[in-house]
Amino acid sequence: MSSTLREASKDTLQAENKTYHYYSLPLAAKELGDISRLPKSLKVLLENLLRWQDGESVTEEDIHALAGWLKSAHADREIAYRPARVLMQDFTGVPAVVDLAAMREAVKRLGGDTTKVNPLSPVDLVIDHSVTVDHFGDDDAFEENVRLEMERNHERYVFLRWGQQAFSRFSVVPPGTGICHQVNLEYLGKAVWSELQDKEWVAYPDTLVGTDSHTTMINGLGVLGWGVGGIEAEAAMLGQPVSMLIPDVVGFKLTGKLSEGITATDLVLTVTQMLRKHGVVGKFVEFYGDGLDTLPLADRATIANMAPEYGATCGFFPIDDVTLEYMRLSGRSDDQVALVEAYAKAQGMWRQPGDEPVFTSTLELDMSSVEASLAGPKRPQDRVALGDVPKAFAASTELELNTAQKDRQSVDYVLNGHQYQLPDGAVVIAAITSCTNTSNPSVLMAAGLLAKKAVTLGLKRQPWVKASLAPGSKVVSDYLAQARLTPYLDELGFNLVGYGCTTCIGNSGPLPDPIEQAIKKGDLTVGAVLSGNRNFEGRIHPLVKTNWLASPPLVVAYALAGNMNINLATDPLGHDRKGDPVYLKDIWPSGQEIARAVEQVSTDMFRKEYAEVFEGTDEWKSIKVEASDTYGWQFDSTYIRSSPFFEEMEAQPKPVQDIQGARILAMLGDSVTTDHISPAGSIKADSPAGRYLQNHGVERRDFNSYGSRRGNHEVMMRGTFANIRIRNEMVPGVEGGMTRHLPGSEVISIYDAAMRYQQEGTPLAVIAGKEYGSGSSRDWAAKGPRLLGIRVVIAESFERIHRSNLIGMGILPLEFPQGVTRKTLGLSGEERLDVEDLTGLKPGATVPVRLTRADGSQEVISCRCRIDTATELTYYQHGGILHYVIRNMLH
């Protein structure tokens, strides 16, 4: 390697009497100049460039550009970043392995070496997205849900077992173990990585990309990582660097301490609201300030977890004493902890009290000002003070959209032989769920202590509330049991339902039939309260119109109150055995009580639960597969089908064709999420995907979810834009994935319209508002549109991961000029679009788009090409990132 800076910076350090080689930033600074005030997150990127300098993908100019960021706290330069490893969950992991298997076949067909389709860096896939809350509220719930999960997903799990033996450096954490981000935080994350290279131990920062947007949770451990689409992760594991612009870094200063009774959840909802308002899309956020001295690592992880909700690429907490304390608690070895400390201090990556790096911009929060909060009814950044929730519920747009004028009456229903009344505003789901909060002992112990006080006073969960507890790791069950709090949670219906994502990703399972019927009969607006990180409309359950994010103790409190109209700050939750009112303040645990309970968490719990993390149950071990390099696709499978994206691929890319006469398939508003574009939850029987499954002999009870069927493109393309809450402005007043087939006026499903347009040879476009593609790092939100024939998406702004995914699938993202929108243009959706001269496209260039209206009049608008880097342009010209990777393997 021609690597003067690289070679000049090579040095050694000692940790626990072991010598490690590393690429020293202080040595590099002799040529680069003083970099001591560079944000710690950028120091991680700088080391990455230094270590990978080869004169081609990483040049000396790249390294100087990153070091020179300090001059203006900004740099307009593309860099090639190579993460140390890749993390996956099964909803995104299964289609990724499908792609890898199909890539092997494509390489073989084109005369290449199939063994090149193998991960070059470690890949951990954690199965956590498949368990559904079918059973709840009793001691058998966990076993029943696990049994159903294995039954429904057997075919997918066989496929993943095949992948385990077919691909090197590919590990699978079996179902029933935990949530990938929590397993990453508690076990997989190293903070500093070390490996043997040419008989030398080399140390470098632990970095990763993950196929789930909440990969950022690991930033709480001082590990730089973020979510990417599955296709980008596949490219990364095959050795392709992640192309990125050197980011702006927003400094978030935390001071003071949380007040008595305020939780980490209240803090993260406040931080999310502040950062959304500030505007951090595509930027790094780095936390600093004396508030970090006493902020537990679990609280840091909670804040880092929600980076996608505040819009940032990551929410980074530098390594310090709190990091080391957590690593010891969670069972990391003494050698590892010593290496982390020595390395971070040697590299200037260690957080010292009083550190004030240079930032692009800054915010500050005195944590003592944080108040008890929820977020809702349908966006994580919409924080509401606890006392204002009834007002926010009443004002929610869902109430206005629906038949709001009529006074909704309570509906009688019979459940288990008893008659009840289901009121409007009922809380029908109360779920302690999600890696965001179940990785945090203080809020879980608070929930258990609140449950204990409630049960002692004789309070009960309201009969219409479906309650559940789904921890992100088995350690949670151990410490709740050790603190003797499990029986009280069980008494209120918060029995263990599984170790996985469950309600947070829409796997809330069915509501009891009498409740579902009562909601439909009374057209009731009901709510879900969950300790999750997302509350987008239609995500948690199709019949639940408002979703509220809250801390675990507040989830328990809402299960007792049972209604969003009750003001938990002033109204009683219920009555004790004497008939006296009981208020939230009467059962809220003190800080001292919570601290005493948290002392029950021990290193032995972590070591016990992670000793055999890759082993799995007997049922998992009994899945046998034949060893083979290529997969034997089953023609009649409704779960796993060969990926169609490489079928007609040739060894050389064809020139990009201009887009002429494109029809608008959908015209959408602001904050359209990847869940709107490609839902993960339940499949309706009368939807195109539901009809496809029934035509292939699948009964409704076996539909499973869209997420579980991502290995079958036939289901997924039919499920594109099929969210029941999506609103296409081309069909006013209609909810769900419908559109008009133009030039006629017939209203049909988006899938059926797209297939007609394909037969007619008509390219397609999508028009949208701000924040298009926010939410999950869902690559099917780009793969599905590609299969429908969408060539271009024109929006007011894009969220980071989705923009990248569109390019990765060969779809052109264009941004309206400032001040121009679909509304200012008066678009009806009947226009035709021409986008020409695509062979001469340049990153960030102005692209003329010609609109031809129904009356024949024309208008040209100058859109901005959101292909931001030269590397992204190369991917687009190849028809997608994986096509580029395959062609590279052939040469």
Please provide the spans of the model-predicted regions:
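Long, structured ligand/cofactor-binding scaffold of large enzymes
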Residues: 54-257, 264-269, 372-375, 394-494, ...
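Segments forming glycine/polar-rich beta-alpha architectures that bind adenosine-containing cofactors
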Residues: 628-702
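Acidic, glycine-rich flexible loop/linker segments
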Residues: 576-591, 803-875
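Terminal amphipathic helices with adjacent charged low-complexity linkers/tails
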Residues: 82, 100-156, 286-287, 292-404, ...
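Mobile "lid/hinge" segments at catalytic clefts and subdomain interfaces of large enzymes
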Residues: 199-344, 350, 443-463, 495-609, ...
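Acidic/polar, glycine-rich intrinsically disordered N-terminal extensions of enzymes
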Residues: 1-82, 124, 619-621, 628, ...
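Extracellular/luminal Protease-associated
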Residues: 288-295, 533, 754-755, 759-799
